[in-house]
Curated annotation (Swiss-Prot):
InterPro entries: Ribosomal_protein_uL29, Ribosomal_uL29, Ribosomal_uL29_CS, Ribosomal_uL29_sf
Membrane-crossing segments per the record: none
Protein's UniProt name: Large ribosomal subunit protein uL29
A GO biological process held by the record: translation
Gene that this sequence comes from: rpmC
Keyword Manganese part of the UniProt annotation: no
A GO molecular-function descriptor: structural constituent of ribosome
Pfam families named in the record: Ribosomal_L29
Family classification: Belongs to the universal ribosomal protein uL29 family.
Record has Ribosomal protein as a keyword: yes
Swiss-Prot/TrEMBL keywords: Ribonucleoprotein, Ribosomal protein
A cellular component annotation (GO) from this entry: cytosolic large ribosomal subunit
Length: 67
């Protein structure tokens, strides 16, 4: 996901998305371990999407604390 797409989500949707991405990452790692993975670049994409989402969540938390 792009950062713009992530920013359009509500905070609750964003938390849910992080959980979904973590589950997908777990499944991808399992596929990698069993040599069933079709696209190994998907691991990188999912990890980066999780990082983007967590960064935006943290920005929102800090913004609320300052307000």
């Amino acid at each position: 996901m792009k950062a713009k797409e992530i920013r359009d989500l509500t905070t609750e949707e964003l938390r849910q998305k992080v959980n979904e991405l973590k589950q997908e990452l777990f499944n991808l790692r399992f596929q990698l371990a069993t040599n069933q993975m079709d696209n190994p670049m998907r691991l990188k994409e999912v990890r980066r999407s999780i990082a983007r989402a967590k960064t935006i969540l943290r920005e929102r938390e800090l913004k609320q604390q300052r307000a």
